[in-house]
Amino acid sequence: MGKRLAMIVTLLVLALLAAPGAKAEGVKRALVMGFDTFQSQPSTTPSSANNVTLMANALSGGSMNLYQLVTHLDDLATTEAFAQAVQEAFDGATDEDINYFYISTHGVWQEGMSNGALQLLLSDGTNEGSITAWEMRRIFDAVPGTKVLLIDACRSGAMLGKGVHGPLENVFQGDDYKVLCSSGGAEESWFWAGETGDGLRSGAGYFSGALVNGITPRGSYGADVNDDGEITLHEMINYLLENHGASTPQVYPEEDDFVLFTYDADSFTGRRREAAMEGISFDSVVLTGDSPRLDFHFTMLRPVQVIYQLVYFGPNGWQFETSQFIYDNAERYGIYGDQPGVLSPGVKERSLSLNELDSDDYGYVLVQILTREQDKLTVQTSRVICVPPSTGDPLMEALVPASFSPETGQELTLVVHHQYPCELTIWVDDAEGNTVRRLTSRRATRPQQLRPLGTTISWNGKLRDGSMAPEGTYRFRIRANIGSEVYELISPTFTLLSPQG
């Protein structure tokens, strides 16, 4: 018999009782669901189950003050059951409310399909079904308020028209949607699974683990860059892009200051940390093929095992099946005896040498720093290391849509094909050749599984000062740095339209 679990938790109902004359604030509700058992795809047990637990705890923590939290695990197999779960979880919502939705499952989509046809698989443990991005939009459109969608599934970025060759529509375009996807439309979204010392199954999604690290004490609220107790959508995507390397997270809207998560920053002190490690910093994520040595440092807060995982990128993607695991044995014969990888508290400086690149002198390497404590494995960070060749024309090509209208919520996605790993700088120039915005500055590329190889980046139509660019004709100016060589490309022009344009 398949697993069936539906739990409803009502939290802090008293928070809804405003003092006389006080301004009423929006109510927060959350629906968290995961699926591990499938007919057409491999089982992910127990990763989605653990993702559900992690996300439920994260969303009900801090100072979120959720009114209601509903979780589902392997107990929905039809679009109708999904719609009913959404209706029940967000029943009573108003236009002022914030509605959180998280899902962990398999995503099914491929180039040539409409991105609205992307499927997220559903299951009740025995029967399997699916829901398309279009159907999700229709169901959530009936929910008043702001909808925050957190999607951990392969190719999920396709629903935003991101991480694909495009141009494709954004299924969730609109002021009332805030969306984070674990991967671009051409990418897998990875999870890990294993066994503990006592034979129990363990595992979780890499994206979900990074997301939880960013918004909980487990990761010292790492996404809150300015330590103000508010983690915005913009802060969250920046944190994920830096600390989650197995896929390329996608966001809508870009550069949005909507507050996703809150916590009491004043009460979070250094006296008692849940995190085992903090302050992870890499000297550079761009290395040279003739000397691929990675230097980094971090601070241990308590003694735990530290393990480095190196995953090389090959023709078919990340080669997790042949990844290297390296215990940090610098202190093996210290006060912790001969237990491999245990480090004492304090600042640590380390170096790793990389090899097995996909060519003689260039490629991508995923470096993950893991800690093991009481047989519990945690991914502390996951960084993509870019190793460009020492020389070589990347043969760049730029693809852009003909037009977009940012004041209606549209964003324009640029696709840059480049044959080699490199550092990209991208400017937006107007028709007179004046630069109105710089989108990136020597940003290291990362594999997005595009064919031909390449990078996607989106522009929301805003200028340096945050105001909207005027209607008119624009183009991208693109520079690729490979070693000491510089290559430049001007994209085709595109038109920024007014809402009536």
Language model: regions and residue ranges:
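Aromatic/hydrophobic beta-strand junction motif of beta-rich domains
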Residues: 294-300, 412-418, 459
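Cysteine endopeptidase catalytic domains of the caspase/legumain-like
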Residues: 24-284, 295-297, 302
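A short tyrosine-centered beta-strand micro-motif
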Residues: 348, 362-368, 472-478
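Beta-strand signatures of extracellular beta-sandwich domains
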Residues: 102, 307-311, 425-429
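Bacterial N-terminal signal peptides
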Residues: 8-17
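Glycine-centered tight-turn motifs at strand-turn-strand junctions
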Residues: 321-358, 435-469
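Acidic, glycine-anchored loop motifs typical of Ca2+
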Residues: 114-116, 129, 199, 223-233, ...
